[in-house]
Amino acid sequence: MTTSFGAAINIAVADDPNPKLQIHNFSGLKSTSNSLLLSRRLHVFQSFSPSNPSSIVRAVSTPAKPAAVEPKRSKVEIFKEQSNFIRYPLNEEILNDAPNINEAATQLIKFHGSYMQYDRDERGGRSYSFMLRTKNPGGEVPNRLYLVMDDLADQFGIGTLRLTTRQTFQLHGVLKKNLKTVMSTIIKNMGSTLGACGDLNRNVLAPAAPFAKKDYMFAKQTADNIAALLTPQSGFYYDVWVDGEKVMTAEPPEVVKARNDNSHGTNFPDSPEPIYGTQFLPRKFKIAVTVPTDNSVDIFTNDIGVVVVSNEDGEPQGFNIYVGGGMGRTHRMETTFPRLAEPLGYVPKEDILYAVKAIVVTQRENGRRDDRRYSRLKYLLSSWGIEKFRSVTEQYYGKKFQPCRELPEWEFKSYLGWHEAGDGSLFCGLHVDNGRVKGAMKKALREVIEKYNLNVRLTPNQNIILCNIRQAWKRPITTVLAQGGLLQPRYVDPLNLTAMACPAFPLCPLAITEAERGIPDILKRVRAIFERVGLKYSESVVIRITGCPNGCARPYMAELGLVGDGPNSYQIWLGGTPNQTSLAKTFKDKLKVQDLEKVLEPLFFHWRRKRQSKESFGDFTNRMGFEKLGEFVEKWEGIPESSSRYNLKLFADRETYEAMDALASIQDKNAHQLAIEVVRNYVASQQNGKSMD
């Protein structure tokens, strides 16, 4: 199968330093609506002018026959088409004196790793700034880059760094006049923002723990290789931000070979973007790599999930591949939905880059480009089904996928606290509330990272791991971190340890209610409910909050997800599990934040009373069913007086306790509840002048 790409073209080049690609009678990549986009081949080559280091794209094409019906396509597709490979008009807009950029440039700058924002707390004129997002495969951040990002936050941002759910930094509050300085500084200090946003492959996730284990190291190497394979090649990023200066990178030969291979019609021949072409992908594309049991990356929420499969000796042999996950949706549109990835097949380790490329090309050729709400890979999977998707992808792969190998149960792993890496060094995972590095915490991190020359890794749960620590440094590092409020996990409320929120207000343009600023109070209220209904301090529930339905903090995988649905209002989602393998469902369509207790108190009370042994809240809600849960809420009249717990501690020998616990479980109670009943009955009998048998 050969990819085709082209159109009748008029190009203004001559002496124009910013040539504009004008394509008429556009027909394009295949879509699920059966329209054809870019149906004729476009032969593109690059030419360089000594007076202008920026790449100039020239093209020739056979005149095309006008299409009978112009296929519908989104406005963003037109912006991409006319952009000279994501350059124009951004390269002009960043040079003028306006504080903002125009609509086309606003879409294009996403490919460069930035979003234009404004402070929504302010009234009157808009105060524009830009958010920059880095790209760090597997969350790896060299010492030098961390220190530079820390400096840039103070010099050009709002004084904070935001750790994201895709293992990257976000730097907020950069003014347009400072964009080029900030971007070029990141580029020249071992960093990049290229492809952190936009319609292309985003940051590739991998377990952040720097274990010196074969499977973990292989997963990280694979994430790096996939990221390199799918990095844009046309040079637009460096043309805009460092005036075309070449940045030398060393790519493994297997990456170069896989990218250039066109034996199965995956590439655009002679194009500066052999995989993406001028139109790139229909929408964002997310990939994660991990090892068996380690679901720290939320593997099933990605467009592609890749799992290392090893033999009995621990030697990596190949990969299970899962496809079609994604979180984003639109309120009150049932045709949009979150979705879990499903098994595609197994490939030997030497084929992984070709398999990933084949999946990406299948989405490129068939994903919808007319309506961006339905452009993610998950909608193609839902439309086609896995069998058709597998069959089409195999044509680009050139082989049959083998059945997925059986894997053990998944676990969520945070890697907080101190751990041995396995090479003689230690690493320390630090909890950062909502990923916001600021104040004393920021200062403490800077001090230890700079003093001990530490590299770091960012986690998919908005936390940070300090790497390469010698045993002798453990105590002084722990002391400095504690002074900055970075405590060991045993000193942090368990509810906070797994909670996540997106930034939302005041800077996110999509937010419709609070998330990061609202979650501290919500967690305190949940903790208070726990205390009222008798849940232990050590018990927890995975809580995730977003300010809109796009799902950046992955609320649809939470045991309790709050999804912004209006000012101070949320949808309530229930049914995710602690190991992130089940999709939550909508329990309440709209709930004012002040009414949270009316819903959560009866749910947590009945969870404590009716749960099975070690049953999580998510598993409990799934077992009960939403109809029964709705009854709990509707009939709730408050915590029964008999369930109130006063400061009474009971002690028993082990044999008595175990017998009591076994008896209590039969009666759907815990040992303490049964003991209280025994005491209550004894007291009542004494008051009535009766003796106990």
From Swiss-Prot:
Q: One cellular component GO annotation, for this chain's record? A: chloroplast stroma
Q: Could you describe the post-translational modifications of this protein? A: Phosphorylated; this phosphorylation reduces DNA-binding.
Q: What is its main location?
A: plastid
Organelle targeting peptide span: 1-62
Classification via Pfam families: NIR_SIR (PF01077), NIR_SIR_ferr (PF03460)
Domain of life of the source: Eukaryota
Where along this sequence does the record place binding of [4Fe-4S] cluster? C502, C508, C548, C552
User: Which InterPro entries does this one have?
Assistant: NiRdtase/SiRdtase_haem-b_fer (IPR005117), Nit/Sulf_reduc_fer-like_dom_sf (IPR036136), NO2/SO3_Rdtase_4Fe4S_dom (IPR006067), NO2/SO3_Rdtase_4Fe4S_prot (IPR045169), NO2/SO3_Rdtase_4Fe4S_sf (IPR045854), NO2/SO3_Rdtase_FeS/sirohaem_BS (IPR006066), SiR_ferredoxin-dep (IPR011787)
Report the locations given in the UniProt record: Plastid, Chloroplast stroma, Chloroplast nucleoid; Plastid, Chloroplast stroma; Plastid stroma
Report the catalytic activity: hydrogen sulfide + 6 oxidized [2Fe-2S]-[ferredoxin] + 3 H2O = sulfite + 6 reduced [2Fe-2S]-[ferredoxin] + 7 H(+)
List the keywords (alphabetical). Answer: 4Fe-4S, Chloroplast, DNA-binding, Heme, Iron, Iron-sulfur, Metal-binding, Oxidoreductase, Plastid, Thioether bond, Transit peptide
One of the entry's Gene Ontology molecular-function terms is:
sulfite reductase (ferredoxin) activity
For activity, the cofactor(s) needed are: siroheme; [4Fe-4S] cluster
Cofactor binding annotation: Binds 1 siroheme per subunit.
- Can you tell me which residues bind siroheme? C552
Q: In which tissues is it expressed?
A: Expressed in leaves, stems, roots and petals.
Q: Name one GO biological process term.
A: sulfate assimilation
Q: What is its EC number?
A: 1.8.7.1
Q: Outline the subunit composition.
A: Monomer. Interacts with ferredoxin.
The UniProt entry's sequence similarity note says:
Belongs to the nitrite and sulfite reductase 4Fe-4S domain family.
What is the role of this chain?
Essential protein with sulfite reductase activity required in assimilatory sulfate reduction pathway during both primary and secondary metabolism and thus involved in development and growth. DNA-binding protein that binds to both double-stranded and single-stranded DNA without significant sequence specificity to reversibly repress the transcriptional activity of chloroplast nucleoids by promoting DNA compaction and possibly regulate DNA replication.
Protein name as catalogued: Sulfite reductase 1 [ferredoxin], chloroplastic
Source species: Nicotiana tabacum
Q: Which gene encodes it?
A: SIR1
